Structure formats: structure tokens, C-alpha cells
Amino acid sequence: MVRWFDRTPREVTRSLLRARTVVAEGDRVLLQDLEPRLDQYLGQLLALQLVVLQQAGQAVKDAPTLAAKANLVEALRIVSTRYRDLVRLLPRDTDPLGAMEPFYASSERFAKEVAGVDWYEQVLSLHVTTGLLTDFFVAYGGGLPDDDRDAVVRVLTRETGQPLLVEELQRAIVANPRLAARMALWGRRLVGDTLLQMYLAVHGPADAAPGATRRLEPAFNDIVAAHTRRMDALGLTA
């Protein structure tokens, strides 16, 4: 049996990005084919949004210039609005704290793993992890009932702070081109950590059934491809 949560982020990334033969249609698992419970789906998503809010707040505090602080405050506002709107989508009489509680500890561990050692790594972490996780939850939400799916997708795609983060990263790299190599390396590490979080969102912290990892890999490849395009736009090698 494969235990992804015992593997390093680099091993996870290598597994997902290596060359592969085409998987038979019947063996491939599409995230859209899974049918998560709405309360559990939103509980996971809200727990992650909460730690993103904490990360964004720290990035505002550590920002080196007034302009950077202003940009990141706006990104923080966007994440806060998203969190509020997702809470409103919980089933009636569902306690938001109760929905998040089973997932919050793992979300906090994830946040610590991707925190970075300085402000530049913090901002790239926000850019990479929120991009990957948004793509993941949009795809994973495809298995929700139509009305719930449409409402969640609207919230997740309506407004993002990505352009603001990109602006700060591009400005930093132009000012100090030597940052690019370190940022590219950090970005690759972030992919592994975030893919692991996505896998656990589907399977939970337990052994996967035989072959489950292999069946999910093609679904994650689409998400990694979108990440690669975002890194290319920054001039960083994904």
C-alpha cells in the first residue's frame, strides 16, 4: 500500500510529474466523479481558508514597503470575503466551527510546512498554494449537487488575490534577480506539500486502497499543469 503522507514533498511531486503511459478510462478517477458531502467539503475548504488568512496577515506584517502592505491588505480582504461567503453555503443549522474542527489541525500543520523563511517565500507560498488549492476544490466540487457546486464555484472564482501577489513577486525579482533561483526551488517544494494536502482531502490520513494513488494522479496532473503556467508567467521554472 502507498502512504503519501510518509513521503517527502519531492517524492510526491516526482510521482505526479513523471512520464507515464495513458491510464485506461475505467481506471482513471476524475475529481468531478467523486461525491463529497457538502458539510465535509466546506469544512475542509474553510479550515484551509482560515490558515490562508493567518498567512496573509503575517505577510502584511512582514511586508518591506508601504505599497506591498497595501497590496497584501487587499489580498487579505479578498480571502476574508471568500471565507465569509463559503460559511454562508454550509447546510442550514451547521456550526462552522464544528464543520472545520476535524480538518483544522491538519490545515495548521500544512500552513507551518509552507510558511517560508522570509517575506518573499511567504508571498510565493500564498500564490502557489492558493492557486493549486482553488483549482483542486473547483474540480473536487464538481461532484456536489448542481446548485451547491455552482454556488461554490462562483465564490472560488469570482475574485482572487493572485494578481496582487504576482505584482509583488515580479517587483521583488526585478529588484533582485538572484531571488529567482531560490523562488523556483521553493515553488517546487510547495507543489509537493500542497499535492499531499489535496490527496488527504480526498482520502483522509489513512492508507489508500491499492491503486488509489495511481488512479488519482492523472486528475492532479491537470492541476499541476495550471500551476506550471502560473510559474512560467513569473519567469520561474516549475
Model-derived regions, located:
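Alpha-helical scaffold segments that form or flank carboxylate-/histidine-based iron centers
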Residues: 36-42, 66-81, 119-122, 147-161, ...
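Short, extreme N-terminal leader segments that mark the start of a protein/domain
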Residues: 1-68, 72
